[in-house]
Amino acid sequence: MSNVSTASGTHFAPPQADRSVTEEVDRVNSRPDELENQEVLRQLPENGNLTSSLQREKRRTPNGKEAERKHALPKSFVDRNLSDVSPNHSLDHIMHSNEHDPRRGSDEENMHRLYNNLHSSNNNVHSKRNSKREEERAPQRRSSSVAYTQQQFNGWKKEFGHAFKKISAIGRLKSSVNSPTPAGSGHRHNQHQHQQVNEEDLYTQRLASDLLDSLLAGCPASLFASTQFLRDEHGKRRAPLLLAKLDVRVSPLKNDNNILDITNSNHNHRGNNNNNTGENSDRRPSIPRSSSIISISSNVAEFMYSRNENSLFRIHLEYGIDEDRLKWSIIRSYKDIKSLHHKLKIVAFQQLTISKLYSDNNRYHSLQLPHFPHYKEMVKERNVMEKKAENKPSSAASAPHTSENNNNDNGSNITSLETLSSSEISEFNIDNVKMKHLQDLIDEPDDFSQPIHLRLERYLRLLNIALCLRPHANRLFEFYELSPLGNLLSRESGFQGKQGYLVIRSTAKAQGWRVSHFGKHAFKDMIDRHTTKWFLVRNSYLTYVSDLSSTTPLDVFLIDWKFKVRFSGNKNNILDNENEINWIIHDPNLEINDELEEFGIENDANNILDKNGKSKTHQKKSNISSKLLLLTLENSERKLKIICKSESSLKQWMSSIIKMSTSTPWSKPNRFGSFAPVRTNSFCKFLVDGRDYFWSLSEALLMAKDVIYIHDWWLSPELYLRRPVKGNQGFRIDRMLKSCAEKGIKIFIVIYRNVGNIVGTDSLWTKHSMLNLHPNIHIIRSPNQWLQNTYFWAHHEKFVVIDETFAFIGGTDLCYGRYDTFEHVLRDDAESLLDQNFPGKDYSNARIADFHDLDKPFESMYDRKVIPRMPWHDVQMMTLGEPARDLARHFVQRWNYLLRAKRPSRLTPLLTPPSDLTAEELKSLPMFEILREKSTCETQILRSAGNWSLGLKETECSIQNAYLKLIEQSEHFIYIENQFFITSTVWNGTCVLNKIGDALVDRIVKANQEKKPWKAFILIPLMPGFDSPVDTAEASSLRLIMQFQYQSISRGEHSTFSKLKKLNIDPAQYIQFFSLRKWSTFAPNERLITEQLYVHAKILIADDRRCIIGSANINERSQLGNRDSEVAILIRDTDLIKTKMNGDDYYAGKFPWELRQRLMREHLGCDVDLVEFVEKKFERFEKFAAKNYEKLHTLSKEGDSGNNWSDREMIDSAMIELGYREIFGCKFSPQWKSGHGNSVDDGSTQCGINEKEVGREDENVYEKFFNSVDYGKSSRKRTPLPKHNFASLGLTFNHRAGIENVGIRDHKVLSTDPRLRKNDEHKKEVDGYGPDCWKKESNKKFKADATEQLKEWALNSLASKVLDDKEMIKSEIPEGFSNYLPNEKDLEMYLTDKTVTNRNKWSMLKRICYLQYLSHKLDERKTQRLKKIKDMRRHLSSSTESTRNGSNSLPLNEKSNEGESTNVDQDIEGDEYHRLHEDILKNQELDDGSLDDLLSQIIPKITNFNSGEIDDAKKEELLKLNFIDPYSFEDPLISSFSEGLWFTIALRNTLLYKLVFHCQPDNAVQNWKEYGEFTELEQEFQINQEKLIDLEAENINSTTTNVVDKDREKEKMRKAAELRMKLSGSLLYGFNQKVFDKHTAQRILERIHGHLVIFPTEWLAKEVESRNWIFNSDRLSPMEIYN
């Protein structure tokens, strides 16, 4: 075991019980010189120069002071070798030594000095003097060592004294025997190893070895822990840092203007993760550990006299022993180091005096300090040497004694402190220290002839050992600018600046804190706020703690683009002119280079220009001085005034802060006035609807390692992220977050604080439910309406950041009602909770009733068999890397602001912002290698923030600025989905200020003037999501919001339509508003229902090249910035795809282009899961064809012109071949067979067709992004893993919340929720012993079900296809698709036709594949529907029988699960199903021909856009359209899509909905009377459905029982006649008044495609004109709430 060190320098090693080892120790101690002589003789060089060997020997000898030891080498041998020194070699050696000397002369001077040294007798003089000195010091060292060791053991455990002596001996034995050649020896093996490991790393290895030995010794390790109980002279706890891990190097600096050329004076970094450039940025400069006396003896005088107490030194420091050890450097003057020494001597004297006043002499142990090298000592020593040289020129070898024990006597007259005798304050004795990393100091004494920087380095290194375990180390940490918090923050990349004590002068209010001035603790708190604090300058912020040893930040001051730094002493108190800059930069302690350019000043200290441009010489004393020593920091939020200790300190802080602010991108202004810069090469993935978002989030939470930030308007703890409940109980969000917290992950949540029952979110339940899960979960509700005087606005952001690396941002809250799929079902009537997709409160309809009783999550709010749920459409997106860091910074800023404003009752930590990702850190992220090719987006985080939400002095509205710019710069179209559309209008004296409406008008006017096509597609909800009918007094919010929307769109002179009409522009040609609606059948009687599909997305897509996704609505609240707080992201994809725009070739960004198509396909009824599945399949075909095209292509050997085929042509042919095999289900096509034959191996063997054999690395975006990381169990065969694990980034400081970062709190009682206090049932329910039966489920089954759920989404009903054998084209396919699926011969002719391009063939194969899957899926639905009819018959029969028996109870619906196989009687189909109600309805039920005639009469005339004539062909197409091609969405501007498909489908769907349901809002309803009529018709339709259901039940019962009851038959006929009369009588008032029977209505609704309808812009317009729309009570509310 190597020697180890403690506070006293005594070395220990583990005790050895072996007797032989003890005997060996005694032998070694008795004969040390003999062993050393043998060792030295073995290491002597056989030939060559001895000088370099002597230099190496100084480092090698373990116990000696110099290489020229008497016992090591005979004098004659030394003299002989010295006389044989080669001049050339000595010159190289001396020049190498001198190159580190700041006062070295020219080459000629060095040559002259070399000649004098080689031919003088100084060599022998120094050798004899040092030998004599060594003899005199030997007995003294031994006696001192014994006394010193005895004293230290008396202070500790005396009973361990004997054991520790043996440990010390064993340590020396292992150093001599096990390591016969010490570090730096001449062994060949060690020499070879030394060539590979540089001196710096070798020293660090020794340091680590010493530290490890100390910890393994046991007692030193316990002493390290005991330092936490120590207090310094000020009562401060000793900082928990190990001085044994600190390395110090000192290099001189010239005190001239060249100091400006040196960089990174106050910069620290970890290992090689530093991204700064400069001479000292990555590696400490090589400083000689010792200097040869030969090389510097002739210029000692020059060196000593040229220095003074203002000499500057750069101190290079390293803390740690690993590769990422902390490295930094500071600049100190000789006076600073001397002042440190004097302060420590004062403390030592005080403790010595106090110890004498007490009988217990051990109350304070003597503080032993190493000797400090004084300049005057060197002068005196030089004078003595010169006098002796004059008096005794022949005996120049008798040099003065320079023992360290006598150095105090030489400098005893320097200060009064030096008069303390060495007996009173004992001096640190290096002879008792046996440590590897101090071996160079042990080998070489403190010699006056050494350069002062080496002597200071020696002093500081010994001081580290002397104060290693003492509380006085705090002074040393302050001197080194080393603190525990700085060490914890050192993992951050970027600039790391100065640390030190400062005093805060500014008031709490100016700093942004809300404090009380009248509480019992107010005065004490005020005093505490203005005492000294330990400040740290970090990469993009400043922070401070209470003292050096604290790790709990008391404030975090962020740098932003409005950051300013000011200092006192000038007129304007602003750093804005040349003199003020010069006043800072010409302090030699400072280093500012490129930063001066920020102020327009060139860095030329010798040639400074005055205001007239003339050169002037810099004066030593500036005209500007600082008397107040005050620094004022200001950002966009607040001010911070701090007082420095001295003018020099003020300049140093100014320098560090300016360098930090200029090095960070956060101090630069950004596009759109945003707080965040533009980021490039970002990965982005859109997530449409809650299903995709929730699944992806659950996967990301499983990957979390560090911190999780959640910012939501509302968060429901009982929300399931995966559905159905069965098998996914563990994916409930509170359980997932609890699991993360138990792993040590820190979770921070911000939610909106609702006021009473005005908003039914129950944030109090959310807060305490989450807090009760685990201490690692922290949550803040905001705003506090009463304290902040904010009653109307809300924190509306919706984003999640995981590990400051992954981010999800958009419009979806993690709460009830947001989960949905692309199908947007209206029903979920499963009896069991485990089978429900929308369990408990998640089954919601805001138009019926708002949320209530949220503390009962599993209780439904409505009758699921009567009231449909309101579907929810939303868009979220996921990003990786730098944009996630920007979002994390916004969260940190919000969190810290809320802490300053609220002062929570619980300990809640302040957070530090993340540093910017470096290139190395980005590469170490998981999935970086996988997603690097897809990381092509340019992104920027935008936000709406103001004074109330973030404390900003100036409101930020970068979201509105981006909206306006994208609309202005759009060339072809914009596509908007938003919850509201309130903009640029005036109503009832209220002016809407956001300019989005004006931007649309301006762009339309420009398009009209240029005669170029331009369109705006805008989707908004049919009605806002507020409960109560619009004609009731309770619907005040609903009416006011709709009024503002209509005023913005079509009503009033300030509306968009009115502004365009004034310019004779038809708005319909350029801007169209749409909405979404859904219909379904409702169990148990298949009753027809409808409900609006609520649009909650907040997106804008411009020209398929740029898009905005976020939480901001188009209204005043979200856009202005000073109301609701919002966040969004702007995306521009640089990966361009060739497509079409208005029929011309066009290059679109991949991300916006795919997002728009995904949304439009969903709205028009395409199966987007199938489209995505087909796209992934054919994408694999493309990759496989590109690798195997030579074996797969079907082209002839030569082309048409006789030339060979190009690679592109062969790849296209191979792709078509693979597509052919997929569609036709064969092994090869006839064309391939004719060219290759049966026996030729194409290399595929169905690979690329059979999905089980294809490399599925790109099969699914979510699986590829989340599941490809290797956690030790997954295979490496398919997906390449990142080179570095995610953990290589390390844990951030925010991960230490609650531990090192304890947090702050106010003096008030803890807040609680009585519903959760001592609520054991809720705790059991969270643990899994509740209604969802989590703990009762089999873990194995649970994991399997959860893992396969995502595949069930996309692969549901895809297990088999309609065409799966050779006769597949001829097999039965659903009616309606027979016109679109071609027969086999037609498809083959198409694929072999040379006139058809390969691109069209490839596109056709995709369409056919999609139709095959879709037809099978519809066939499955038909089977399920027939089964439901059979169940309905059984139910109706049973209900009738039970009614007859006088029972009112109905049996449960015997509904089987969707996935179960059913045996449905095929005789129910067609005519037999029709006969169930034909006797009742007779001719009232319309057939398909009658429906076509009816629709042709009610559909309005369609005018051709180009010719202006009535287009009958388009009207016919509108009637018979029953298929949407999912690959016809590429060109949104061409009239065949925008008018012929998009608008046509919306118009037809709108008419069909009105025809059946008479639903509102609708343009046909102009006044309250018509509103009432439509409401009555809607109710009548529902009543008629119920009557028809009852009659069918009776008819079924009579058919099944064959019982003739005349009275009952008559009653049935009467009811049927009455129903027919109602149905026929309704036609008298026109088709708008027609009420259809259920079966005719269902036939009409089956012609609806998708969910798209036209937004009614003229609903109840007459009532608005007559001022009857708004109730009088509506005018009482503040209009700012609703616009």
UniProtKB/Swiss-Prot annotation:
Task: List, as start-end ranges, the regions of compositional bias called Basic and acidic residues.
Answer: 20-34, 63-82, 90-112
The chain positions of domain PLD phosphodiesterase read 791-818, 1091-1118
**EC number(s) recorded for this UniProt protein:** 3.1.4.4
Cellular component annotations (GO), alphabetically ordered: endosome; nucleus; prospore membrane
Q: By its UniProt entry, which SUPFAM superfamilies does this protein fall under? A: Phospholipase D/nuclease, PX domain
- What's a BP term from Gene Ontology annotated to this protein? ascospore-type prospore assembly
Reactions listed under catalytic activity:
a 1,2-diacyl-sn-glycero-3-phosphocholine + H2O = a 1,2-diacyl-sn-glycero-3-phosphate + choline + H(+)
Q: Which GO terms describe its molecular function?
A: phosphatidylinositol-3-phosphate binding; phospholipase D activity
Sites bearing Phosphoserine, chain numbering: S8, S30, S145, S1461
Residues bearing N-acetylserine are S2
Family membership noted in the UniProt record: Belongs to the phospholipase D family.
Any idea what job this protein has? Required for meiosis and spore formation. Seems to be involved in the coordinate induction of late meiotic events. PLD activity is induced under sporulation conditions and seems to be necessary to complete the meiotic cycle, but not for vegetative cell growth.
Quaternary structure (record): Interacts with SRF1.
Name of the protein in its database record: Phospholipase D1
Organism of this sequence: Saccharomyces cerevisiae (strain ATCC 204508 / S288c) (Baker's yeast)
Upper lineage is:
Eukaryota, Fungi, Dikarya, Ascomycota, Saccharomycotina
Name of the encoding gene:
SPO14
